[in-house]
Amino acid sequence: MNKISIIGSGFVGATTAYTLALSGIAKTIVLIDINKDKAEGDALDISHGVPFISPVELYAGDYSDVSGSDIIIITAGAAQKPGETRLDLVKRNTMIFKDIVAKLIKVNDTAIYLIVTNPVDILTYVTYKISGLPYGRVLGSGTVLDSARFRYLLSKHCNIDPRNIHGYIIGEHGDSELAAWSITNIAGIPIDNYCNLCGKACEKDFREEIFNNVVRAAYTIIEKKGATYYAVALAVRRIVEAIFRDENSILTVSSPLTGQYGVTNVALSLPSVVGRNGIVNILELPLSQEEIAAFRRSAEVIKSVIQELDI
């Protein structure tokens, strides 16, 4: 049936609905928001373009309408108030998620739950813990977008199609994330070797510049236009495609870890096999010892916040 429900019709939720409608992968898309008028307006606006794309039924609904959904995407959440700490915001969003997830589970406990709201790693773990859903059926957008930014910036440097660049940003979707430089390659050629071939410099300063631009990307965009939503909507579309097409594609989604690199009791991003039933497997990359240590530090950052939450 390929039915999707999107909880939250803000910038990210509405743009995700539009992007999914354009993709033609869903037969039904439901928009649900506390502001019903906003959801109805977005649904109408997108629906009026359906004659130009593949047929799709798109409408605003309520929690009862998530029944029969194959994927439930959650983009809803509170925005940070002036002077509010990150931890206070996390606590507020945790309370919001407890309410949302409880309502959703009553209606649909067979869907795959895809979390997009930030901080996505923490809220993915919160959803997993309070939903009682089987492992693999709760995942977050994680560093799928960060990895795309990484490949894009490398593609500009190397003048190569980003689809031919293989590299990952892993760990937290946030300031403690890390680039897995030790395995980054172009057509199987390690990035340092490729840079030598094309005459481009790939010294430490180059790596720092690329990585810092990845980490700072959202801040830069928010400073210029107030929010990010186009690229993340495309990242969500890519995850949805992998699920509906049962691709077993490798994407850096966020999910509860089960001992990878010695890490448990936290959700973080690692390259994961994604198919019809959600996460099939999490891959452990042959990282350097320095990268493994950085990944574990990223886990501790998230764990320290989770320990402050009532879940």
Curated annotation (Swiss-Prot):
InterPro entries: L-lactate/malate_DH, L-lactate_DH, L-lactate_DH_AS, Lactate/malate_DH_C, Lactate/malate_DH_N, Lactate_DH/Glyco_Ohase_4_C, NAD(P)-bd_dom_sf. It holds the Pfam family Ldh_1_N. The modification Phosphotyrosine is found at Y219. It is found in: Cytoplasm. Its main location: cytoplasm. GO terms for cellular component: cytoplasm. This is L-lactate dehydrogenase.
